[in-house]
Amino acid sequence: MRYAFLVETYATERIKVLSVWSEFRDEDLPVRPRPADPRGRSVHEQMVHQCVSEDLWFRNMLGIDVCGAGAHMLPPQETRLEFIRRYAEDSGKRLSALQSKDEPWWEENVKFFDVQRSRAWVMVRRIAHTSHHRGQLMAMLRILGREIHSNYGPTADTGGLMANHAPTVYAYESVEALLAGEERGGAKAKLPGADGKAVTERPGRAPAKAGSSPPLRSGSE
């Protein structure tokens, strides 16, 4: 099927969301990028937004409703583990629905806010939207001084730069393993660290002057 790559991408993206959520602690949920600035979503609000936004896009744009018209898109108790369980369940149902769709379904135009776009186009935008917010949460983990497992490739905690052949180390091998591990209090893969190697492209260097932008090497995280 021509659009199988979108289904496969969603299947891996949902795991990445859950993996990043699993890196937080319960006490992190109220944390914002700047404590006194309400413009930046807290960790809690990012989880709420992911559940609500994805439900709305799938239901109103793609025609896939797994939450009963939005009635059950949030967990009854808004804790870290309950958000993980809710998103794992709902995104799994969405994945099953996507796997049943044929090419004409993907190519049909639907309403995307105030314009018409194909469902395939909408799905690309949905994946990008999710990735954007996941990146914000990964930045929050660094602000909190936490370790980060792989999301797309190496991170500073899995070995540093891809150019130095740092390994990719995922927190869990599957959604099922993630749920089981987090219910036991956490059972993530061990992180090797960088063993003294550089973990960023310009370690220890002063910021470049305005107008100067040297090319970057393939990096991490």
PLM-predicted stretches and their roles:
Residues R205, G211-S213:
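Ser/Thr/Pro/Gly-rich low-complexity, intrinsically disordered segments
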Residues I64-K101:
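Helix-adjacent hinge/juxtasegments
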Residues M1-E8, E78-I84, V124-I127:
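Active-site rim elements
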Residues Q99-F113:
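Acidic catalytic patch
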Residues P214-E221:
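A cross-taxon signal for low-complexity, glycine/charged-rich
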Residues Y10, R14, W21, Y87, ...:
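Hydrophobic alpha-helical core bundles mediating ligand binding, dimerization, or RNAP-core interactions
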Residues V7-L18, L29-M73, K111-L178, E182-A206:
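Short, contiguous alpha-helical
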Residues F24-D26:
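Membrane-proximal, proline-rich intrinsically disordered regions
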